[in-house]
């Protein structure tokens, strides 16, 4: 009996420790991809992206190891009120060696407080670095609405017919503003802070199975005292977004229309750019001028077509029209059908086409890319991960223009601008060619 009594306090302590550990369990989430590939003409795997396009079709066309590791925890809860701490560290290396050192990117560190305001039930207050309500097309890894960065906001305010969210975030550009030093010399090393103010109204039910989201983003350069912007800089701009999401065929379809002005045109996703400068091959500074407008019309989704077939798809038209004539018209269309042989094995094909017209030259670059992959994945959905795939990719392109980065901006008036492929006897763009690659890759999110 004495032995039993002696063991009882220890058992209680262990049980309490286990319960405490469970109550304070850390959430571990993330994303990663890595693999190995070869090019048909020799050497390591090459990846194919059309000059002037802001993304590429990614299946069998990713040449790096990339990972995001997220740790988070609900650190306090009382009734329906809670605080959650979230972090995210990202890594990217060229996957060419065993030991590849890199500096990590600290992408998220924020606290989210839910139901803290009595008269706004269901809302969340947050502050810190955060991936904020990002909208993307997975199959081309294209983020068309993404203001992520250090910031603060109040989201998911129930207004009866939808959810209202308010946020402010920041992104900085190197060398964007200057101060007078001496002898008529200006120092362009100071970073320029770009602030973005975001308002969204989401989850508005406008038809059976369909919701509407509307958003307005205003971005502007925020200068320090006694500093001035680079001549010709794009100091502010607007982005307007309307997105309709429809439930269809056990999946979804998203139709998006976006219009942007000036500093919000180049990235086209809600972050301001153009108040900074770039540096040429000789480290001379030249301004980035994004004044103009952007129109984007996008349709994408993922659907199920019976027990054995799933498919992703995308179609997009984007027109960036700049006052300096260095804009582009880009349209892209692609599909990724998946046939499921078993609940964990499938064959996936991706077919994508890009066409980019230079505003300055009127010439066009185009590329089509086809990938066939045999895949083993954790489930029978096109979204199931982890997945291990072996693939073969073929790409053919014909490029009639490219960007001129020869020399420096002081002696080359075309530096950083679009020029014809044979401009001044040179060779710009990728020419007219084709190539194929093959390899294996894993991809996981959890």
Curated annotation (Swiss-Prot):
Presence of the UniProt keyword Transmembrane in the record: yes
Family to which the UniProt record says this protein belongs: Belongs to the porin LamB (TC 1.B.3) family.
Organism for this UniProt entry: Escherichia coli (strain SE11)
Molecular function terms, GO-annotated: maltodextrin transmembrane transporter activity; maltose transporting porin activity
UniProt-listed PANTHER family: CRYPTIC OUTER MEMBRANE PORIN BGLH-RELATED
Catalytic activity, as annotated: beta-maltose(in) = beta-maltose(out)
Keyword Transmembrane: yes
Cellular component annotations (GO), alphabetically ordered: cell outer membrane; pore complex
Topological relation to the membrane, as annotated: Multi-pass membrane protein
InterPro entries listed in its UniProt record: G_neg_Bact_CarbUptk_Porin (IPR050286), Maltoporin (IPR023738), Porin_LamB (IPR003192), Porin_LamB_sf (IPR036998)
Described purpose of this protein according to its UniProt entry: Involved in the transport of maltose and maltodextrins.
Signal peptide segment: 1-25
UniProt cross-references to Gene3D superfamilies, sorted A to Z: Porin, LamB type (2.40.170.10)
Gene label: lamB
Protein name per the record: Maltoporin
GO biological process: monoatomic ion transport
Site (Important in sugar transport): 143
Assembly and binders: Homotrimer formed of three 18-stranded antiparallel beta-barrels, containing three independent channels.
Main location: membrane
Record localization: Cell outer membrane
